[in-house]
């Protein structure tokens, strides 16, 4: 029983020590020296113009001005960065040429092989179908009132 008690204390001290170390590292981390929104916009422009497969990490580094390590630390991978750009697009799809180009890139380059990208594309197109229906309905009602 005593062995179990001491083993439990040891495990508790390891958890506390790991927790302290984790908190210490969080406090000592440097704040980001870039605006994530700006980086997403720059990546969005690049992906829309060059496609997903046509955009390299070097292209993203040049476009965003981030170091390669900072890009990977902030976003994990080119694929994750693209997903974040798509999620941002889903929140503010504006029917601009760039938005349509990016959606086309997602549907063509990644959606056939990536379930998460397919889901985001469905969310974008599904929400826009409702918008089209509302706009069309409003337009039809206006035409009917004219007659």
Map each language-model feature to its residues.
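Short, intrinsically disordered or compositionally biased N-terminal tails of bacterial proteins
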Residues: 1-28
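Helix-turn-helix
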Residues: 34-38, 42-80, 84
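Generic structural signal for hydrophobic core residues of well-folded globular domains
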Residues: 85, 89, 110-111, 144
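Amphipathic alpha-helical segments used for helix-helix packing
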Residues: 98-139
